[in-house]
């Protein structure tokens, strides 16, 4: 059987979800403690990149785009990630701050989806995080004009070596085009795989100063 024949069998690829359910008694009054518990369990399970999340934004024509970004902080104010401010996602968020995040913890048969609005972080927050990064990562932030077209990888590697030489003494300065966003928590949905495709879904939705919690059909 050829590779193409194998690929044509994808309609038959499936498995049962058997790792447990999510019941109302398992829920917390607000979504953050449950998210924190699930994230800790994802870390304890040694999942690859447990803080990786799909970030979805929309351009001026209504075309959605997605990419994987790492969560770097979260609290009651929202979820934080950092990026090049000249990137496609940053331009999208300037025009339309609506955003969706998705944490796909496949091995635990779980996912968490967050929807809200993104706002730029303060310079103080960005500087503090930037200088906590490995030095080579700080230099790497200077190298790439994110999402621009380049002729070859060698262009990036040459620029990296040039800047590494330039910044060999003292601190690497924060690029003016590098920053971060905080995503407000307006809706948070928890999904747990269930047997016979009877998955458990609970939606937390802002309701004044509190949260409304609904079970959703799978």
From Swiss-Prot:
Similarity annotation: Belongs to the pyridoxamine 5'-phosphate oxidase family.
Q: Which organism is it from?
A: Cronobacter sakazakii (strain ATCC BAA-894)
The UniProt entry, under Pfam families, shows: PNP_phzG_C, PNPOx_N
Into which EC class is this enzyme placed?
A: oxidoreductase
- Where does the chain bind substrate? 14-17, 72, 129, 133, 137, 197-199
Q: Which residues form a coiled coil?
A: none
The cofactor binding remark recorded in the entry reads: Binds 1 FMN per subunit.
Query: What reaction does this catalyse?
Result: pyridoxamine 5'-phosphate + O2 + H2O = pyridoxal 5'-phosphate + H2O2 + NH4(+); pyridoxine 5'-phosphate + O2 = pyridoxal 5'-phosphate + H2O2
Cofactor(s), by name: FMN
This chain's protein is named Pyridoxine/pyridoxamine 5'-phosphate oxidase
What NCBIfam families does the entry give?
Answer: pdxH, PRK05679.1
Listed pathway(s): Cofactor metabolism; pyridoxal 5'-phosphate salvage; pyridoxal 5'-phosphate from pyridoxamine 5'-phosphate: step 1/1; Cofactor metabolism; pyridoxal 5'-phosphate salvage; pyridoxal 5'-phosphate from pyridoxine 5'-phosphate: step 1/1
Give the gene name.
pdxH
Q: What does the entry list as the binding residues for FMN?
A: 67-72, 82-83, 88-89, 111, 146-147, 191, 201
Keyword set, alphabetical order: Flavoprotein, FMN, Oxidoreductase, Pyridoxine biosynthesis
PANTHER family per UniProt? PYRIDOXINE-5'-PHOSPHATE OXIDASE, PYRIDOXINE-5-PHOSPHATE OXIDASE
Subunit composition and interactions: Homodimer.
Q: Which Enzyme Commission number(s) are listed?
A: 1.4.3.5
């Amino acid at each position: 059987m050829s590779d193409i024949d194998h690929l044509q069998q994808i309609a038959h690829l499936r498995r049962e979800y058997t790792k447990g359910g999510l019941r109302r008694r398992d829920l917390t009054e607000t979504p953050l403690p449950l998210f924190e518990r699930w994230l800790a369990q994802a870390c304890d399970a040694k999942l690859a990149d447990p803080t990786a999340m799909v970030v979805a934004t929309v351009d001026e024509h209504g075309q959605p785009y997605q990419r994987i970004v790492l969560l770097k902080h979260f609290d009651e104010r929202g979820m934080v990630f950092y990026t090049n401010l000249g990137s496609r996602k940053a331009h999208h968020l300037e025009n339309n701050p609506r955003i969706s995040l998705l944490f796909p913890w496949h091995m635990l048969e779980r996912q968490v989806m967050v929807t809200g609005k993104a706002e730029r972080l303060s310079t103080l927050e960005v500087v503090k995080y930037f200088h906590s990064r490995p030095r080579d990562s700080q230099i790497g932030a200077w190298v790439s004009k994110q999402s621009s077209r380049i002729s070859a990888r060698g262009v990036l590697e040459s620029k990296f070596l040039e800047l590494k030489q330039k910044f060999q003494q003292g601190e690497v300065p924060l690029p003016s085009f590098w920053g971060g966003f905080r995503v407000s928590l307006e809706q948070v949905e928890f999904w747990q795989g269930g047997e016979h495709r009877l998955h458990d879904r609970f939606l937390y939705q802002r309701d004044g100063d509190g949260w409304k919690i609904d079970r959703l059909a799978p």
